[in-house]
């Protein structure tokens, strides 16, 4: 059985001449990038583990120096690579909080169990997330990820129950 990997960042460029790379994090936990930790990089269908030698934040980027990457030429080859961790390596979330990959694909039903569609995307707006629900017919529904609307999320059953506010459909 192959392990399932979750993307936590993307290599977008090099930084300096000593083999550092710029990462755009796709995690809410940039502190997960820790010296001496190993992390997988998926590039052109190949996954390889690297050891984090140094890590720091710079503007909206995380800068990482991998032990195995000696210079800028080697770092160039990592551009476009996805930093990934296994499910077991994910930072545990507090109860009632979910990773985006857990939300996307959930069936959405209203308080009467009427199916509304499937979560296709999560928009991160700053104030609160918004779930984009694809319907089999008609326009997408935008559902704010707030407790007064989202009444229940059941990852095991693959279902989200919502109480629609007037005007959402």
UniProtKB/Swiss-Prot annotation:
Subunit structure: Binds ribosomal protein uS19.
Designated gene of the protein: rimM
Sequence ranges assigned to domain PRC barrel in this UniProt record: 95-168
Main localization of the protein described in the UniProt heading: cytoplasm
Any GO molecular function: ribosome binding
InterPro entries in UniProt: PRC_barrel-like_sf (IPR011033), PRC_RimM (IPR056792), RimM (IPR011961), RimM_N (IPR002676), RimM_N_sf (IPR036976), Transl_B-barrel_sf (IPR009000)
An example Gene Ontology CC term for this record: cytoplasm
GO biological process: ribosomal small subunit biogenesis; rRNA processing
Family stated for the protein in its record: Belongs to the RimM family.
Keyword terms, alphabetized: Chaperone, Cytoplasm, Ribosome biogenesis, rRNA processing
Protein name: Ribosome maturation factor RimM
UniProt signal peptide: none
Record remark: domains: The PRC barrel domain binds ribosomal protein uS19.
Subcellular location: Cytoplasm
Organism: Desulforamulus reducens (strain ATCC BAA-1160 / DSM 100696 / MI-1)
Biological function: An accessory protein needed during the final step in the assembly of 30S ribosomal subunit, possibly for assembly of the head region. Essential for efficient processing of 16S rRNA. May be needed both before and after RbfA during the maturation of 16S rRNA. It has affinity for free ribosomal 30S subunits but not for 70S ribosomes.
Disulfide bridge map: none
